[in-house]
Regions:
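Extended, low-hydrophobicity segments enriched in charged/polar residues
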Residues: 2-158
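Acidic, proline/glycine-rich low-complexity IDRs
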Residues: 142-208
Length: 208
């Protein structure tokens, strides 16, 4: 992948990262970004997801290298764990309310399965999962729900949702998404917050 995001930087000291570490069963990858370039709509969002994918790959590599140090005291140079072809990514603008929707839990059965006031996506038919579903319905039970989801997003979008530009992206442009295509699902969104001139990229992919 030819990397186009050198004008971008990850906001590694943002307090959101400290908060999300407390949710250790959350499988979403978040990336908070500032950009030296002026906002250019679709083009800026596409740069943001390319930048975020690289940062998430670097995190994954760092984690594996740290594990090697802990296990054997030495490391080997490793390539990034997946490939990306950003030219294949296609995005569509959506309403912030669609991204941040919180469904009603109608009931919970005796084994803990929840039933909602909306249908669930079928990844085998190419349907992408919703943000709430990615947050609190991962392949293995998280124990999270609407309260935790709202709390996380109140920190992620501290000025509210009125000035958010949101794009939902296809997930056929990186093998990061391969696991999720097997069963549970995939998702990728980019959000530009006009109030604080910040991008948030939200990605998820998992299987059992």
């Amino acid at each position: 992948m030819a990397f186009q995001g050198s004008h971008m930087r990850e906001l590694v000291n943002d307090p959101f990262y400290e908060l999300i570490e407390q949710y250790d069963r959350c499988i979403i990858d978040y990336c908070l970004i500032e950009d030296d370039n002026p906002y250019q709509g679709y083009r800026s969002h596409k740069d943001a997801i390319a930048f975020a994918m690289r940062k998430v790959a670097e995190r994954d590599t760092d984690t594996r290298l740290n594990d090697e140090i802990g296990n054997c005291g030495e490391t080997q140079d490793e390539p990034l764990p997946w490939n990306s072809y950003i030219e294949n990514a296609k995005g569509r603008q959506i309403d912030p309310a669609e991204l941040l929707r919180v469904p009603v839990i109608l009931r919970t059965d005796r084994v803990g399965q929840r039933f909602y006031d909306c249908g669930l996506p079928d990844p085998l038919k190419g349907e992408q999962i919703s943000y709430w579903y990615a947050f609190w319905e991962p392949p293995h039970t998280s124990g999270y729900g609407p309260d935790e989801f709202r709390k996380v997003n109140s920190v992620l979008f501290p000025k509210g949702a009125d000035e958010l530009d949101v794009y939902e992206w296809t997930t056929d442009w990186s093998n990061y998404f391969d696991d999720g295509h097997e069963w549970w699902g995939t998702a990728c969104w980019s959000v530009y917050d006009k109030n604080i001139n910040r991008y948030v990229v939200i990605m998820a992919s998992a299987t059992d």
